[in-house]
Amino acid sequence: MNSVLSHRLMRPLAAAFVGVITPLAFAPYQFWPLALLSPFILLLLLHQQSAKRAALIAYLWGIGQFAVGISWVHVSIDTFGGMPKIASLFLMTLLVGYLALYPSLFGWLLNRLFPNNSRSKWLCAAPALWLITDWLRGWVMTGFPWLWLGYSQIDSPLANFAPIGGVELITLLLLFCAGSLAYAVLNRRWLMACIPLVVYATGYGLQAMQWVTPQTERTASLALIQGNIEQGLKWLPSQRWPTIMKYTDLTRENWDADVIIWPEAAIPAFEYEISSFLHNLDAAARMNQSAVITGIINQSDDKQYFNSVLTVGDTPHGEYRYDLTQRYHKYHLLPFGEFVPFEEILRPLAPFFNLPMSSFSQGAYVQPNLIAKGFAFVTALCYEIIFNEQVRDNVTPDTDFLLTLSNDAWFGRSIGPLQHMEIARMRALELGKPLIRATNNGVTAVTDERGRIMAQLPQFETGVLKATVTPTRGSTPYFLWGTTPLYLWVGLAAGFAFWRQRRAR
């Protein structure tokens, strides 16, 4: 292999190619074995390279992965950013280049701290360092934990580890398997190549575990409204009431549902502007013994703006009244979409930095469950569903469902909304709670507590998804402990590998 890769450009080019094909492991392609093959090849390419060289190789792997895997971001920048194509491509290049720094850091740390070809390097250090750099990517500058390798395994046997340690545990196991294969190939210890078989077989066996129990005596009939409102028209004043009446008409046909759910910011107006309409909607819902959950925009007395969710109809609060303390307010805001860092500098530069509804304030990190028709919903608005610890910290023993409202119309007919749905499915599996996802134009769907899609609407069509969903009782290990055991393992594994490295010297 070294002879094939002896030319100084071969390893970086090979890494870039492997990075490019890595997104095929994720939705909509879901060729999940690539999520094991890709880091395995990357580890081989890093072998016997200087730390500086390893950083370059891993950086190009990251460039390939993110240039393809998050290409959908450019759809939003190019379509709604109001800037020349060259400028939108430049911004996209900056984003991809930034995200690739994290794989680069992994490569540098691995070969700087562990230059030898040892078993502890491949089986302990590599998985630990990968997880550390993933965590950093999910935290720095509000975080962007998209394309974590574990998400690709939602339909593989490894998915059954999610209720134990979340998506991070799956990522850790992928790197553990990749490291064992790298060690086997580099040292001709072929027995080590059996480790992935054992790990996947264990995952398959875990399918029999029943972490939670369906409450068959309690079922909720739901109607999810997919309005399919064109993003370019959504915030035009002339389209406000046509949009609201479209959702109202679709709702009127489905008052037999326990809970009717509209998507994120389905009502393109501030709540205080349409209080009469909401009073009427509340009265109609209560008359039909139903409840409506909808996304809406709010403004507080001190002129702070919130991306909110409200419930009307059969709720514990009685008749509708304008009270912001009884709303869910989005906590994790999307940079440049819902708030603009350094806005005094950036907003004058281009329309992209001055999009509609891009001056929001944060809600609280932990908020009460929304109650509708006696069911408790943990809410995550759009981007928030990718932050697993935030969702987990809002779940209580009384939570019935995970609810995520979104508007992915920003990203057109790209792979982004399908990746988004894949991530949402993982939240259901981790926490053992059915997930309800209502969107403007897809993917609108309902999953069971194992993240399996039970019902789904076609994308880019107006429609109503009717489904009966059963809540669960009980707790998964991940709900009880979160990622704390993984933090401990990473610290111990990295420390052990470093100790072995020093001892070998």
Swiss-Prot record:
Could you tell me the keywords of this UniProt record?
Answer: Acyltransferase, Cell inner membrane, Cell membrane, Membrane, Transferase, Transmembrane, Transmembrane helix
In short, the EC number is: 2.3.1.269
UniProt domain CN hydrolase: residue ranges: 225-471
Q: Which InterPro entries does UniProt cross-reference here?
A: Apolipo_AcylTrfase (IPR004563), C-N_Hydrolase (IPR003010), C-N_Hydrolase_sf (IPR036526), LNT_N (IPR045378)
User: Which Pfam families would you find in this protein's record?
Assistant: CN_hydrolase (PF00795), LNT_N (PF20154)
**Enzyme class, first EC level, given as a word:** transferase
Residue numbers annotated as active site: E264 (proton acceptor), K330, C382 (nucleophile)
* Cellular localization per UniProt: Cell inner membrane
Q: What are its GO biological-process terms?
A: lipoprotein biosynthetic process
Q: Give the stretches traversing the membrane.
A: 15-46, 55-75, 89-109, 129-149, 161-181, 192-212, 479-499
- Taking the first listed entry, what is the main subcellular location of this protein, grouped into a coarse class? membrane
Q: How does it sit in the membrane?
A: Multi-pass membrane protein
GO MF terms here are: N-acyltransferase activity
Similarity remark: Belongs to the CN hydrolase family. Apolipoprotein N-acyltransferase subfamily.
NCBIfam families given in the database record:
lnt (TIGR00546)
Described function: Catalyzes the phospholipid dependent N-acylation of the N-terminal cysteine of apolipoprotein, the last step in lipoprotein maturation.
HAMAP family reported for this sequence: Lnt
Quote the protein name from its UniProt record. Apolipoprotein N-acyltransferase
Species: Vibrio cholerae serotype O1 (strain ATCC 39315 / El Tor Inaba N16961)
Q: What is the lineage of its organism?
A: Bacteria, Pseudomonadati, Pseudomonadota, Gammaproteobacteria, Vibrionales
